[in-house]
């Protein structure tokens, strides 16, 4: 490394190999927060859809810092989170070889949007999914069998999770009709309490504010924006070769020694970039907006302008946010409309940054398509006045 003054071991992290397309479109929760029996039963994760980004102005609460009581401007992401519907329970047993599925119980009525998930082509299918299972609830023998399955869970299970799905029909920005289905772990209380808690919410909605609170630190799991097949300079960040290099300069000149007579996995190579499964830790919830309530609006204690959270002209490539939403500090994985999994933090947050109370002064709702100057349509009309017809 003759051109460097200091050491630089390599370009690009090897911790995320292989850099290949994710096998799943929705982020998978590979580990849930640690269970605490002393706490009441609660769900540990949720599913949302990325709408877009805007920025806010707030006052910093950091005694002793030069920024204390000063205004700061920060980027935020809006994630639309319509209520989930619980349609099942699944129990797991801890074994020496890891978790093993014990049994599962489903609700009687499953909507069309979740039954679509069990077919590749809904239009050409016979649409028979769960028709036999639903008949169990109509007979005494079937009801008895379901109760026996629940009792079996209470007796043998180590972990209980609910099966929940999104209400994608409420999403105005998405054309997809197939709901996203996932397992969500129930933490708190005894196993019997967890089974009763999950069974109690069969075919009922769970809003986002039942899982997360304002100022909470959460993790976001999702699949990044896909970039396709790209070269080594973009994919790994290696240095471009000098201008006079023969046969291209956006390359790795030496891909290894003669022996061992193979290319090492540590050498930067061209290939797939993006559409990788990633987990982002410690994203702070700045605001929870509830549909049909004042919290859904973008007005604050300092800015009483009547305006909705959706910017003028809608979020580019998404549209209007009509349902519940979360406002998260910073960015988040994936493009617009991408489904993201939201999980409670695995660690107990003790830092001053995590415990800081957020008081928003201003939420920007100017157009995100171009250089937005106005916060509302009325403001724009007042500025321009009556235009010639």
UniProtKB/Swiss-Prot annotation:
Where is the stretch described as Disordered?
A: 1-36
Q: Which Pfam families would you find in this protein's record?
A: Ribosomal_L3
Tell me, which GO biological process terms does this entry list?
Answer: translation
* One term of GO molecular function: structural constituent of ribosome
Q: Does Ribonucleoprotein count among this protein's keywords?
A: yes
Would you say which domain of life the source belongs to? Eukaryota
List the keywords (alphabetical): Cytoplasm, Ribonucleoprotein, Ribosomal protein
Quick check: keyword Cell inner membrane in the entry? Answer: no
Residue stretches of biased makeup (Basic residues)? 18-31
Q: Which Gene3D superfamilies match?
A: 3.30.1430.10, Ribosomal protein L3, domain 3 (4.10.960.10), Translation factors (2.40.30.10)
Subcellular location per UniProt equals: Cytoplasm
Q: Mind telling me which GO cellular component terms the entry cites?
A: cytosolic large ribosomal subunit
- Give a short account of what the protein does: The L3 protein is a component of the large subunit of cytoplasmic ribosomes.
Which family is annotated?
Answer: Belongs to the universal ribosomal protein uL3 family.
UniProt-recorded name of the protein: Large ribosomal subunit protein uL3
């Amino acid at each position: 490394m003759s051109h460097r003054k200091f050491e630089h071991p390599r370009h690009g992290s090897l911790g995320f190999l292989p850099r290949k397309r994710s096998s799943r479109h929705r982020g998978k929760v590979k580990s849930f927060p640690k269970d605490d029996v002393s706490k009441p039963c609660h769900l540990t994760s949720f599913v949302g859809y990325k709408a877009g980004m805007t920025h806010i102005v707030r006052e910093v609460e950091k005694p002793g810092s030069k920024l204390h009581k000063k205004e700061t401007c920060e980027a935020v992401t809006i994630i639309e989170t319509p209520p989930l519907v619980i349609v099942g329970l699944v129990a797991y047993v801890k074994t020496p070889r890891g978790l093993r599925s014990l049994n599962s119980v489903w609700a009687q009525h499953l909507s069309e949007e979740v039954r679509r998930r069990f077919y590749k082509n809904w239009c050409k299918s016979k649409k028979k999914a769960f028709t036999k299972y639903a008949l169990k609830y109509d007979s005494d023998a079937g009801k008895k069998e379901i109760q026996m399955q629940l009792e079996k869970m209470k007796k043998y299970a180590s972990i209980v999770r609910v099966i929940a799905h999104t209400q994608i029909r409420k999403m105005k920005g998405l054309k997809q009709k197939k709901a996203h289905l996932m397992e969500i772990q129930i933490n708190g209380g005894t196993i019997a309490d967890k089974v009763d808690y999950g069974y109690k919410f069969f075919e009922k909605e769970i809003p986002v504010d039942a899982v997360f609170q304002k100022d909470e630190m959460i993790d976001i799991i999702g699949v990044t924006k896909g970039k396709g097949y790209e070269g080594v300079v973009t994919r790994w960040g290696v240095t471009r070769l000098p201008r006079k290099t023969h046969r291209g300069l956006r390359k790795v000149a030496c891909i290894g020694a003669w022996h061992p007579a193979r290319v090492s996995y540590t050498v930067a190579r061209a290939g797939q970039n993006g559409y990788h499964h990633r987990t982002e830790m410690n994203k702070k919830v700045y605001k929870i907006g509830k549909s049909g309530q004042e919290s859904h609006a973008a007005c604050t204690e300092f800015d009483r302008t009547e305006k909705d959270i959706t910017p003028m002209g809608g979020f580019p490539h998404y549209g209007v946010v009509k349902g519940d939403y979360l406002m998260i500090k910073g960015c988040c994985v994936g493009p617009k409309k991408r489904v993201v999994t939201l999980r409670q933090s695995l660690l107990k947050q003790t830092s001053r940054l995590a415990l800081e109370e957020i008081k928003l002064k201003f939420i920007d709702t100017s157009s995100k398509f171009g250089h937005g100057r106005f916060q509302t349509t009325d403001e724009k009309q007042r500025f321009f006045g009556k235009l010639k017809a």
